[in-house]
Amino acid sequence: MGNNKIYLLFVVCFIIQLSCKEESKKAIKTAPVTFKKEGDLRILKKGSDSLLTTLDIEIADTDYERETGLMYRSSMEPGHGMLFVFDDVAMHYFYMKNTEFPLDLIFVDDQLKIASFQKNAQPYKENSLPSKVPVKYVLEVNAGMSDKWTLAVGDSIAYRKTP
């Protein structure tokens, strides 16, 4: 009778094992988000209008583009930036959630003048990065670039969309 119990236990375990199929693991493949040149942007020194730098830019002018920004990207090439264009002049707040590299945020008013900065914003931080004054545009560039270019409040930008 002891052998029957062992045999029955073996059969039950075997049936359970057969019924527990490992579900095939579905690999979710996401395409990397890459830079798409949508315009050119120049930064000009206040007073002299001398050219400080020129950038290839992506333009974020829809709700989705403004909400996503540079999230889910591992880096940004030197000479690239993202220009956020808002419908209204207002206080705008940014954060670095899901952004993988540090950025300088350059806040620009409706006259295309630099109004304030948030320098060296760190990856993945969810703290608020406010514009400090009402603005219409925000330019994101790699961290350290605003100092390298010696940008100051009152400098200006000029941009154009590429066809």
Where do the language-model regions lie?
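C-terminal motif of bacterial Sec signal peptides marking the signal peptidase cleavage site
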Residues: 16-19
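Bacterial N-terminal signal peptides that target proteins for export
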Residues: 1-8
